[in-house]
From Swiss-Prot:
GO terms for cellular component: ciliary membrane; ciliary transition zone; MKS complex. Transmembrane component of the tectonic-like complex, a complex localized at the transition zone of primary cilia and acting as a barrier that prevents diffusion of transmembrane proteins between the cilia and plasma membranes. Required for ciliogenesis and sonic hedgehog/SHH signaling. Keywords: Cell membrane, Cell projection, Cilium, Cilium biogenesis/degradation, Glycoprotein, Membrane, Transmembrane, Transmembrane helix. GO terms for biological process: cilium assembly; non-motile cilium assembly; smoothened signaling pathway. This is Transmembrane protein 17. The gene is TMEM17. InterPro entries: Uncharacterised_TM-17. The chain crosses the membrane at residues 45-65, 78-98, 110-130, 142-162. The keyword Electron transport does not apply.
C-alpha cells in the first residue's frame, strides 16, 4: 500500500525544498552513491521501541482519564478524549510512514512521517503534558515525557536522514545527467568523424 501519486509528488517536492543542501555546488564523487544505504538505524530502533511503547501509553492514558474524568470540566473532557483519539489515529499512520520511508528509503513517506511528528503529534502531546487544567497524575506525566522524548528524537533523526536521502538523490541525478551528457558528446564525436570521412 503506497501513498497516492499527488500526495507523493507534493511530499517529494516539499522534501527537496526543505532538506536539500543549498551549499552544495555539484555532486560529490567520494563513494558510489548507488550502493550507499542512507536509512537511519537510530531512527529505525526508535520506531521499533515506539511501536511497543505506544500501547502502554494508550492504556495508561485511558486509565488515568477514567480516574480523573469526574473532576475535569466538560470542555476538558471533550478536548482530552478528542486528543487521545487523534493521537491514536495519527500514530498508526505516522509509524507506518516512518517504517516505509526509512527502510525502503522513500523520501515522500519519510517526509510525511516527519511532518506528522512535528506538526501534529508533538504539539498534541505537549498540550497533554503541560496544560495545568488537566491535573496530570504522576503516571500520566511519566508516559507523556517518554512519548515526548521519542517524538523529539524521531523528529531530529528523521530530519537528518531526510537530508541525507535528498542529497544522495541529487547526487544520483547529477551523475546520471553527467553520464547522459558524456554519452551524447561521444555520439556527437562519432557523427563528426563520420561527416569528416565523407
Amino acid at each position: 500500500m503506497e501513498l497516492p501519486d499527488p500526495v507523493r509528488q507534493r511530499l517529494g517536492n516539499f522534501s527537496r525544498t526543505v532538506f536539500s543542501d543549498s551549499n552544495r555546488t555539484g555532486p560529490e564523487y567520494n563513494e558510489g552513491p548507488d550502493n550507499e544505504m542512507v536509512s537511519s538505524l537510530a531512527l529505525q530502533m526508535s520506531l521499533y521501541f515506539n511501536t511497543y511503547f505506544f500501547p502502554l501509553w494508550w492504556v495508561s492514558s485511558i486509565m488515568m482519564l477514567q480516574m480523573k474524568y469526574s473532576i475535569l470540566p466538560d470542555y476538558y473532557k471533550f478536548i482530552v478524549v478528542t486528543i487521545i483519539i487523534l493521537i491514536t489515529l495519527i500514530e498508526a499512520i505516522r509509524l507506518y510512514l516512518g517504517y516505509m520511508g526509512n527502510l525502503q528509503e522513500k523520501v515522500p513517506e519519510l517526509a510525511g512521517f516527519w511532518l506528522l511528528s512535528l506538526l501534529l503529534q508533538l504539539p498534541l502531546i505537549l498540550f497533554l503534558l503541560f496544560n495545568e487544567g488537566l491535573t496530570n497524575l504522576p503516571l500520566e506525566k511519566a508516559v507523556h515525557i517518554i512519548f515526548t522524548i521519542f517524538l523529539t528524537f524521531q523528529v531530529v533523526s528523521a530530519f537528518l536522514t531526510l537530508r541525507k536521502m535528498v542529497n544522495q538523490l541529487a547526487t544520483r541525478f547529477h551523475l546520471q545527467d553527467f553520464d547522459r551528457l558524456s554519452a551524447s558528446r561521444g555520439d556527437m564525436r562519432r557523427v563528426r568523424s563520420c561527416i569528416e570521412e565523407i
